[in-house]
Amino acid sequence: GTKIWTSSAHIADYMIAIFRTSPPTKENRRHGLTQFLVKMKQPGIQVNPIGQITGQYEFNEVVFTDFFVPDDHVLGEIDGAWKQATSELAYERSGPERFLETYYVLTELVRAVGKNPDTRSAEGIGRLVAQVHTMRRMSVSVAGMLQAGKEPVVEASIVKDIGTVWEQQLPHRVRDLAAFVEETATNRETLEKQLSFAIKTAPKLTIQGGTTEVLRGIIARGLGLR
């Protein structure tokens, strides 16, 4: 089989993967999935790096052909990986990296406008910072639920959806505000370079960790809408 969009597989010694180990049932089509720890450096595994518009290679396609995984590399319950995976995703989807991946362009903008920004810049930056604080509180709230032993699948999906859409839009908002930055700003060149990089990398943000469409389906089910 083939797995697409595997982060850092080209430099990894091991990866975690879910494979079908028995047929699904009529009652549960997700039954029969098992999670394994897979050794990457072995025959039957081919990693194809995927180039990005930024020139980086971060994601990969992994092709499996007649490779072997020993029994002691099973993670968790045999045939019960779906529940494990959805629980694990609550950790992945609610963390601060889901709204801070392009945050550096905002900090560079703050440096560029200096201590006495014009009214438009001050209002724009203030609005963005308020949104960051709101998302941080949401992320911390989900962390508290996880610490209490709960499974905030819907709540984590909301954080990821709101956060990645926001950080995808952030470089464009900063670009609009950067138009008012003085040409003499000491970090003007740095800001422009970081903006260029952030705009190129932003499209991936609503795909990695679960696409926006998948997340909204999870949220809809949690609310009883589907």
What kind of feature is each model-predicted range?
Residues 2-46:
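A short core secondary-structure module
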Residues 4-9, 53-54, 204-209:
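Glycine-rich phosphate/pyrophosphate-binding beta-alpha loops
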Residues 5, 14-16, 35, 59-63, ...:
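Tryptophan-centric aromatic hotspots in well-structured domains and transmembrane helices
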Residues 20-24, 39, 43, 65, ...:
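Short, well-ordered loop/turn and helix-capping segments at boundaries between secondary-structure elements
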Residues 45-137, 205:
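Glycine-rich beta->alpha junctions and the first turn(s) of the following alpha-helix
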Residues 84-91, 95-99, 178-226:
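Glycine-rich phosphate/cofactor-binding loops in nucleotide/flavin-utilizing enzymes
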Residues 119-122, 133-190:
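C-terminal helix-coil-helix/basic helical segment that borders enzyme active sites and/or dimer interfaces
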